[in-house]
Amino acid sequence: PPEEPALEAKVPEDSDMRGQWGKRPQETIDRANELLDDFASLLTKRGIRVDRPTPIDFSQPATTPDFHADSQFGCMPPRDVLLTVGSEILEATMSYRCRWFEYLCYRPLMQKYWEEDKNFKHESAPKPRLTDADYHADYLSEKIGVEKRLKWTAEKFFVTTEEEPLFDAADVLRFGKDLVVQHGFTTNLKGIEWIRRHFSDHRVHAVNFPGDPYPIHIDATFTPLRPGLILNNPQRSLPDEQRKMFEKNDWEIIDAAQPAHNSPPPLCYSSTWLSMNVLVLDPKTVCVEKSEVYQAEQMDKLGMEVIPIDLRDAYAFGGGLHCCTADVNREGSCEDYFPNQT
């Protein structure tokens, strides 16, 4: 998509993506679709039902009475849009203008689930207006450097304002009765408060990671593997004060292994830390991108069965193994993993 207030602050100054927008080369699209098809096939063979979205024409502009974006994004990462809590799937507000209509790709599935399951609840958070008031104009990246941005993120001063509730589903982690939500570029405090009021039977905790100059989505920063164990990006450590809830409930937070790559693929929004963007199938089984040998080795040492998945050539379309999936239904009940609250 073209630059917009939320995107300008995410794309590093030296990125190849600067100034580029429009349809990607067809061979890269075909390759990404091939890899996603293979991943879906592997999951299906393991007895997992896999449903796929219905893409719209993302080359169309995204236009509302409040804004105009010359093109849209895509629907590779459903994790960003859909949040499943209990019997409910909630559509996030989204904070990028180019992603405002992305929810439409999942509406056929939402209708299908509603017809299949009388207990299913389909909810949509209030769509934000995304006017200029939603963004700090002085966050334009050509005016600042990484050091200043790190200072701002440490002070919890992000590109998004508190004009209205904003959140992406990929900023939310589910721990049974507790929801952990990252405060950053794509989720503001009003968004976290909206989640808290909406899921009133859950405990909602805000976290932030000062070492990340581009804090967007949590899965390449803080990744639960099984009850009692979490991977944390060593460059984006959870602050000591926010660790107390985990420590009081005997959770171990360990540093993730280093990425196998020194740079992300061409025209990719994400960092090399997609290495820890893994898909946990159950407490003993995890999908890891096949080139991320160090992360796979760490998982093996932690006693997990590692399933290598070829997905790196699809990263540029929206992220890694967790990004390109969204849970609809998992076995089990809602447990209390943090009975000792701070």
Q: Which residue ranges define each predicted feature?
A:
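The feature marks the mature, well-folded catalytic cores of soluble enzymes
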Residues: P1-T342
